[in-house]
């Protein structure tokens, strides 16, 4: 595997509470997960608890409550006096058998939901903490500040999770061990029990089977995060299963014991909305900050005002130039995107000078993303520099429609407050040793979550291109890991380590070629014609991309795996296996707009798309699953799932793997790259859709389709 060695780095430090962070920082991955819920580059961490009452597991489950409960159970065995235990993801190892102190399927489900986001930069313990913020905000609750830096346990922790049959004195002693006084014990219990409820299958002495819908009794009558649980208790309103006469008979009326521990003083105060929200924000943050001694938490995560992303330095033009690509994310919470005229990078060359002239890199608008409380706009760029001058640092300049200019300098009071970008490895430099490290998620038999396994190999110099030396390293990966592993390239010299880290193996080419090869290659596609196209009825609907430097070859690469690709308006690229019947052929002369990246080529025009066909395309067929027929592409939605039985998410998902997971159910279906659903019945409102709507590929298998956005491929069991 040939690795382009480029390191983009900067020193970082977190300052006071909620101060603007300095990029890059240890929080960067979790900051994205926390704030990019929907839209462009959305991470989707909040999808599992959106809306508040939602659960992939069906109507008797509330994922938001399960996320909060998982954090409490993980933390609850901690000892604030000895510094042992706390929120350290030891719960991963504590779910064997019947669950012990952790009864119910919600813990495994929660950990499985977090697994796709688990990485070297987002520990499982930090994800559990982030889950509390996400679940509470999704349900309309207050902001629970999240500090990061938790270290995952490697074995089960001590016992000591509070159980409903405990006495009031035992509860007080257990919470004292955790670091909570009596008032905070009452508050954190009420804040945790404002969502969710009790399952009869888990606690039949508390909820008698058959006595509640779906054998699931809620703590109060609302699904949102509110003070209702406290209001009901103070007002004597029945409903909370942990204060009921049924629970009292078996001495499992846990909320009654806890709420009355200070003669109702705290629970009465919590019946006030303002008090409830402010108190819950405080005690839930306190809960997720019970950590083992030796763990140093960062300042609370705050959103960047301006955040660079996807930065890459690459040799180009046979080593005569350096290409610099990336994106700038601008926070638009208090400054709408419509007020921004342009975003620019103002840079210095290698020596810190301005021999580049104006030294400005322009950007183009890419899209917007939203979180619970913030919004963001993304601006992409691509620039090239002579290798002799290159680039060393830059500021970000935001120009508003009013003419006002705001310059962001990364909080660096020294060196003109600019981001620092390292040089490439020059052949006259003392390079020291270069190493390639690849991290994969390795399944383990003990737990539902994988382990992170890192393999490292030395890289050796291969050739020189201009003033640079190229290095290569070879490391074998199983096919299942090739599309979702992370890799780092590090240079150690004179005791200092510079690394280009947390890169996706999915971004690498599937084949290696000598750098600067000029061997002619024949394209694998032919021109299919010029066609009409409109935003309301696209000719190709499976995928879409916009690049300012678009070319025919670039669009072909972006649409690899699809039968057709098409170019429009100079910079737009569309993909699909079928062409819409609403798109009519037009004269070739009407597809006359030059491509943004090569003016000698044409890339469609306004409402005209130049379509090409992949000559080596192999039709994607639904695999034959013994005992099942492929039924078709159906509509689906998070609020009314087509199949509402079991669910699993797996980055290695295939049709065969989903069939195995569903284990003989009448229906199973695949959707949205990696999702698998099972069910005995189909939702009546789900309707058959065009096959082109189910044009997504599996994340790790480009030979099978995996539904689409709100579209699911359904397989039906044969009548025997």
UniProtKB/Swiss-Prot annotation:
Top-level taxonomy: Eukaryota, Fungi, Dikarya, Ascomycota, Pezizomycotina
Signal peptide: 1-24
Domain WSC: 524-615, 627-718
Glycosylation, residue list: 4, 108, 181, 264, 296, 318, 474, 549, 581, 629, 640, 663, 701
InterPro entries: Haem_peroxidase (IPR002016), Haem_peroxidase_sf (IPR010255), Sialate-O-sulfotransferase (IPR051589), WSC_carb-bd (IPR002889)
Gene Ontology biological process: response to oxidative stress
One GO molecular-function entry: peroxidase activity
Source superkingdom: Eukaryota
Record's keyword annotation contains Lyase: no
Keywords associated with the record: Glycoprotein, Repeat, Secreted, Signal
GO cellular component, as recorded: extracellular region
Protein name: WSC domain-containing protein ARB_07870
Compartment(s) of residence: Secreted
Family: Belongs to the WSCD family.
């Amino acid at each position: 595997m040939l690795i382009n060695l480029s390191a983009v780095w900067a020193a970082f430090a977190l300052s006071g509470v909620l101060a603007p962070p300095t990029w890059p920082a240890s929080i960067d991955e979790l900051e994205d997960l926390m704030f990019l819920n929907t839209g462009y580059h959305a991470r989707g961490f909040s999808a599992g608890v959106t809306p508040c009452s939602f659960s992939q597991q069906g109507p008797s489950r509330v994922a938001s409550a399960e996320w909060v409960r998982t954090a409490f159970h993980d933390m609850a065995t901690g000892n604030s006096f000895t510094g042992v235990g706390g929120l350290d993801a030891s719960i991963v190892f504590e779910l064997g058998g019947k669950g012990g102190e952790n009864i119910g399927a919600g813990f495994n489900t929660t950990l499985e939901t977090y697994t796709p986001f688990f990485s070297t930069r987002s520990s499982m313990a930090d994800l559990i903490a982030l889950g509390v913020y996400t679940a509470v905000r999704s349900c309309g609750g207050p902001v629970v500040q999240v500090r990061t830096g938790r270290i995952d346990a490697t074995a089960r922790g001590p016992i000591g999770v509070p159980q409903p049959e405990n006495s009031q004195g035992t509860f007080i002693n257990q919470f004292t061990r955790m670091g909570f006084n009596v008032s905070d014990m009452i508050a954190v219990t009420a804040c945790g029990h404002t969502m969710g409820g009790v399952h009869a299958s888990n606690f039949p002495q508390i909820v008698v089977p058959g006595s509640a819908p779906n054998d699931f009794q809620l703590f109060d009558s609302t699904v949102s995060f509110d003070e209702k649980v406290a209001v009901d208790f103070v007002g004597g309103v029945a409903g909370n299963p942990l204060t009921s006469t049924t629970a009292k008979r078996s001495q499992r009326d846990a909320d009654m014991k806890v709420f009355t521990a200070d003669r109702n003083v705290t629970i009465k105060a919590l019946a006030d909305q303002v008090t409830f929200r402010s108190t819950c924000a405080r005690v839930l943050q306190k809960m997720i900050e019970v950590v083992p001694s030796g763990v140093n938490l960062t300042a609370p995560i705050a959103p960047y005002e301006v955040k660079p992303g996807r930065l890459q330095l690459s040799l180009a033009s046979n080593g005569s130039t350096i290409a610099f690509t990336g994106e700038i994310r601008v926070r638009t919470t208090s400054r709408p995107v419509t007020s921004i005229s342009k975003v620019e990078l103002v840079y210095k060359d290698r020596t810190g000078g301005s021999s580049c002239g104006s030294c400005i890199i322009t950007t183009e608008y890419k899209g917007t993303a939203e979180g619970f409380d913030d919004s963001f706009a993304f601006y992409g760029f691509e620039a090239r520099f002579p290798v002799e001058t290159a680039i060393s640092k830059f500021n970000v300049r935001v120009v508003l429609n009013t003419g006002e200019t705001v310059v962001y300098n990364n909080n660096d009071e020294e060196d003109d407050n600019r981001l620092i970008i390292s040089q490439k490895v020059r052949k006259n430099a003392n390079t020291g040793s270069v190493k390639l490290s690849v991290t994969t998620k390795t399944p383990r038999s003990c737990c539902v979550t994988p382990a992170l396994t890192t393999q490292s190999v030395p890289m050796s110099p291969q050739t020189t291109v201009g003033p640079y030396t190229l290095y290569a390293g070879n490391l074998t990966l199983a096919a299942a890991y090739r599309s979702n592993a992370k890799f780092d390239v590090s240079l150690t010299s004179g005791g200092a380590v510079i690394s280009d880290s947390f890169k996706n193996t999915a971004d690498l080419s599937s084949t290696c070629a000598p750098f600067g090869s000029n061997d002619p290659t024949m394209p694998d596609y032919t021109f299919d014609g010029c066609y009409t196209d409109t935003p309301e009825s696209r000719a190709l609907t499976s995928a879409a991309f916009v690049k300012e430097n678009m070319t025919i070859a670039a669009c072909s690469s972006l649409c690899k795996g699809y039968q057709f690709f098409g170019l429009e308006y100079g910079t737009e690229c569309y993909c699909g296996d079928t062409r819409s019947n609403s798109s009519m052929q037009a004269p070739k002369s009407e597809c006359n707009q030059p491509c943004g990246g090569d003016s000698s080529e044409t890339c469609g025009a306004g409402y005209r798309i130049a379509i090409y066909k992949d000559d080596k395309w192999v039709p994607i067929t639904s695999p034959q699953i013994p005992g099942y027929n492929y039924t078709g592409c159906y509509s689906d939605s998070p609020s009314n799932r087509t199949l509402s039985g079991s669910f699993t998410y797996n980055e290695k998902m295939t049709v065969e793997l989903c069939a195995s997971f569903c284990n003989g159910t009448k229906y199973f279906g695949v959707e949205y790259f990696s999702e698998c659903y099972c069910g005995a019945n189909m939702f009546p409102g789900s309707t058959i859709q065009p096959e082109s709507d189910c044009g997504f590929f599996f994340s790790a298998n480009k030979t099978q389709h995996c539904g689409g956005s709100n579209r699911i491929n359904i397989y039906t069991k044969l009548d025997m």
